[in-house]
């Protein structure tokens, strides 16, 4: 049990140095302790879809939940609350008091590298999902840190870019999810973003931080993103409480100097220290484990499976191709994702999972009597797959000297694969600024032939196989996007190998500062990283031919492919919406021979181009599904779960159609949010542009009827008694299922341009076949309000408001109305 401390007593008695120490982290994950006054260190931990703990390298395995867009696609408050509880319990097992999540930035572009981390393109849906998962997490005693406040909606030059956005768009779109969280959840911490907003970094922008504390009357601990503090004086005076990580770069002795010059007041230091102590006092109540451990329990697996299955969106099901009958005799599974599931995106979302269920294993389990044919068809990886199951006796040795010198071994760590990130690794005597490491292990290939090897590095590295150099990624390097945007491109080498023969693999690695490559706008965590991958060299045309052959033979074909953490990750944005090279050709070739019995399962966190969509009878969007990816997909494909997911973002047919196409990267250090409030479906509806699949879309194996007239009461809007819209919904189909009713508001004509309609409520209802139920959706004052830039306030405009209830943004099934009798202005939440 952590000893208690009195905040006022501590502040009155600690030294100035102790106060200043509180204002920055002690190391990569912890706050400073003051043992004399029983002030403990508080442990923070990533990430958005699972709890990694304190180690990027050789971390303790963890539960991996579906990605943010997958959770958003459930449109299910209760499930998100349960997900939050699971994350909180995982934190406790890892000894962590504070979860660095959720992410609630906006997917203004389908190309954003971290788009998969956030819930939705709509601020209302994003805010409600965030509120639910936060309340679940904090019910365990763990503090949530909602992030990234605000405008970190793309990765390109994220530390340097100046986001130019109108006050109206800032308030109505980008701040709104945080505002909902402030109103409904009051999490204990808020993380600032790396970027600038309208000329000034958020972390040192008093106007932005005052919105939180003065406008919304929410007073969380405000911490920086990791290495996202850029000044001493401005950040402290603006309201940043905690610089992370430690050791400090801008506080400590620099605060002392600024105080001597009276650039920072003593009262400011005390105020910031008080907030840190309040955070520590609250966080220290969490009953965390003394050691980092796992907790892989059956009930957690069941929840993860439910989360995955309920997130899956049935995009297309012509002729009721799905569900596939379990009596099928022969089924073809095609795609590299079949045996290598994409469980998460990259960056802060990466972790070592307890396990990962592949679709192949799940189908074998679901169809014990069927003949299952498998072909990869085309590789979907960007970096060659890491070596793991064919690796044995692997360790990494650490030194302060390069391999050509006489050197002293400082540490040895066992490894289970050939990828490592050392940003938070340390060992006694190791010079973190400049060190070297040697990975050695035994590789036993399972197939004879020519093997491709790929080596990507943040630092420098060379690969030797049986002491023969195969790849040199040290002498000449080309910058790529790996490792948060700091790594090289993948350098490739080849070697002829024999199945069953054991080969000695050796990687000579130099830490980050051994590389001359530098980049603007990316986060330099230090330490370095490397990824060695390998696979049998294959002829792409022959791979497709093999896939076509099994598709032609089978009664049903499932093509499961898409993106993965190589393509969607923190640190870089996608250059286009395309699937990996060769995937579209594979799908088209399979459809040529088996279009009437083929289901396409796409795994990605954000939209991809589907030039073959008009030919496919069945299309399923499966996101990144976490530990239970294979089970979740199979449950839907074979009808054990009736799909109920709805798209949390619009799915454009072409990347050029999206509203940010001309403004999706830093140009001259700035990024113009030229679409203003017209993000996602707001844009497509305003300009009348068709999308491939609309926001809120998702099919079911059953059918529903909704009463065409919504009863809205009271008919006159009052903030003291806001209206509720009520409809009858009936399951008119053959099986139980869930329908999400989405409430959109169409504002009256105004001198201020408004979107055609905006989401302001939703509810998900589960009904047995033939069951009918009355369903109500509450309407709050946000539904009638827009940000008046002249008055600098919210404006609720008089007039008649249309209530449009739909099963997607384009399928409006019920209507009603209410009126606002008098225009009012307001602030706050």
UniProtKB/Swiss-Prot annotation:
GO cellular component assignments: extracellular region
Coiled-coil zones: none
Subcellular location: Secreted
Record carries keyword Transferase: no
Pathway stated in the Swiss-Prot or TrEMBL entry: Glycan metabolism; cellulose degradation
RNA-binding among keywords: no
GO MF terms held by the record: beta-glucosidase activity
A Pfam family the protein falls into: Glyco_hydro_3_C
Active site, renumbered: 225
PA14 domain location: 389-548
Predominant location: secreted
Glycosylated sites: 13, 304, 473, 602, 627, 664, 749
Known EC number: 3.2.1.21
GO BP term (any one): cellulose catabolic process
Source taxon at top rank: Eukaryota
Top EC category: hydrolase
Keyword field: Carbohydrate metabolism, Cellulose degradation, Glycoprotein, Glycosidase, Hydrolase, Polysaccharide degradation, Secreted
Reactions catalysed according to its record: Hydrolysis of terminal, non-reducing beta-D-glucosyl residues with release of beta-D-glucose
Family: Belongs to the glycosyl hydrolase 3 family.
PANTHER family (UniProt xref): BETA-GLUCOSIDASE, BETA-GLUCOSIDASE H-RELATED
Role noted for this protein: Beta-glucosidases are one of a number of cellulolytic enzymes involved in the degradation of cellulosic biomass. Catalyzes the last step releasing glucose from the inhibitory cellobiose.
Protein name, UniProt field: Probable beta-glucosidase H
Annotated organism of origin: Aspergillus fumigatus (strain CBS 144.89 / FGSC A1163 / CEA10)
Lineage of origin: Eukaryota, Fungi, Dikarya, Ascomycota, Pezizomycotina
């Amino acid at each position: 049990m952590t000893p208690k401390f009195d905040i006022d007593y501590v502040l009155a008695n600690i030294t100035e140095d102790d106060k200043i120490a509180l204002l920055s982290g002690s190391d990569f994950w912890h706050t400073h302790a003051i043992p004399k006054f029983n002030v403990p260190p508080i442990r923070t931990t990533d990430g958005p879809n699972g709890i990694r703990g304190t180690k990027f390298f050789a971390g303790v395995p963890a539960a991996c939940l579906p990605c943010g867009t997958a959770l958003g696609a459930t449109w299910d408050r209760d499930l998100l609350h349960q997900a939050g509880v699971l994350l909180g319990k995982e934190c406790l097992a890892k000894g962590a008091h504070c979860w660095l999540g959720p992410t609630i930035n906006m997917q203004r572009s389908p190309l954003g590298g971290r788009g998969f981390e956030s819930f939705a393109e709509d601020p209302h849906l994003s805010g409600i999902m965030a509120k639910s998962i936060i309340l679940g997490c904090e019910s365990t005693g763990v503090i949530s840190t909602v992030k990234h406040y605000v405008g970190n909606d793309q990765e390109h030059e994220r530390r340097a870019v100046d986001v130019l956005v109108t006050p109206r768009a800032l308030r109505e779109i980008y701040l709104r999810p945080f505002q909902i969280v402030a109103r409904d959840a009051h999490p204990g911490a808020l993380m600032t973003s790396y970027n600038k907003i309208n000329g000034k970094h958020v972390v040192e922008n008093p106007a932005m931080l005052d919105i939180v504390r003065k406008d919304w009357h929410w007073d969380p601990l405000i911490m920086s993103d990791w290495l996202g503090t850029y000044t001493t004086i401005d950040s402290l005076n603006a309201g940043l409480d905690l610089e992370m990580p430690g050791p400090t770069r801008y506080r400590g002795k620099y605060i002392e100097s600024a105080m001597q010059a009276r650039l920072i007041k003593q009262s400011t230091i005390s105020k910031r220290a008080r907030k840190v102590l309040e955070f520590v006092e609250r966080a220290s109540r969490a009953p965390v484990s003394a050691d980092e451990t796992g907790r892989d329990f059956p009930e957690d697996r069941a929840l993860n499976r439910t989360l995955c299955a309920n997130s899956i969106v049935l995009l297309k099901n012509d002729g009721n191709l799905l569900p596939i009958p379990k009596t099928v005799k022969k089924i073809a599974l095609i795609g590299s994702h079949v045996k290598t599931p994409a469980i998460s995106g990259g960056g802060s979302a990466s972790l070592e999972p307890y396990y990962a269920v592949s679709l192949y294993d799940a189908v074998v389990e679901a169809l014990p009597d069927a003949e299952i044919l498998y072909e990869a068809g085309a590789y979907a990886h960007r970096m060659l797959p890491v070596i793991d199951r064919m690796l044995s006796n692997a360790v990494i040795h650490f030194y302060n000297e390069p391999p050509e010198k006489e050197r002293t071994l400082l540490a040895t760590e066992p490894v289970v694969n050939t990828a490592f990130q050392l940003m938070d690794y340390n060992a006694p005597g190791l010079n973190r600024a400049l060190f070297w490491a040697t990975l050695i292990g035994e590789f036993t290939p399972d197939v004879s032939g020519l093997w491709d090897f790929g080596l990507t590095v943040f630092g420098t590295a060379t690969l030797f196989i049986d002491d023969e150099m195969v790849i040199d990624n040290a002498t000449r390097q080309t910058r790529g996007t790996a490792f948060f945007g700091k790594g090289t491109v993948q350098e490739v080498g080849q070697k002829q190998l024999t199945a069953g023969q054991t080969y000695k693999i050796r990687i000579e690695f130099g830490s980050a500062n051994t590389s001359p490559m530098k980049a603007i706008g990316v986060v330099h965590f230090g330490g370095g990283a490397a990824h060695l991958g390998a696979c049998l060299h294959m002829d792409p045309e022959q791979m497709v031919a093999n896939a076509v052959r099994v598709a032609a033979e089978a009664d049903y074909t499932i093509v499961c492919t898409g993106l993965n953490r190589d393509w969607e990750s923190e640190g870089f944005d996608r250059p286009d919406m395309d699937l990996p090279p060769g995937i579209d050709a594979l799908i088209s070739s399979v459809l040529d021979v088996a279009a009437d019995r083929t289901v396409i399962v796409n795994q990605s966190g954000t939209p991809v181009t589907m030039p073959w969509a008009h030919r496919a009878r069945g299309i399923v969007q499966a996101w990144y599904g976490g530990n239970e990816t294979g089970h979740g997909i199979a449950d839907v494909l074979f009808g054990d779960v009736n799909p109920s997911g709805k798209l949390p973002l619009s799915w454009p047919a072409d990347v050029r159609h999206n509203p940010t196409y001309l403004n999706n990267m830093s140009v001259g250090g700035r990024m113009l949010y030229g679409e203003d409030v017209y993000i996602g479906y707001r844009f497509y509806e305003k300009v009348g542009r068709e999308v491939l699949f609309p926001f809120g879309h998702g099919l079911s194996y059953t059918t529903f009827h909704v009463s065409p007239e919504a009863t809205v009461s009271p008919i006159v809007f009052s903030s003291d008694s806001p209206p509720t819209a009520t409809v009858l919904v009936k399951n008119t189909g053959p099986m139980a299922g869930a329908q999400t009713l989405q409430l959109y508001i169409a504002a009256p004509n105004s001198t201020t341009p408004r979107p055609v309609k905006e989401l302001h409520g939703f509810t998900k209802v589960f009904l047995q076949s033939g069951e009918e139920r009355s369903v109500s959706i509450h309407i709050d004052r946000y539904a009638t309000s827009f940000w008046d830039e002249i008055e600098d306030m919210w404006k609720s405009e008089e007039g008649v408001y249309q209530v449009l209830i739909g099963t997607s943004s384009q399928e409006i099934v019920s209507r009603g109305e209410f009126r606002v009798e008098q225009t009012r202005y307001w602030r706050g939440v």
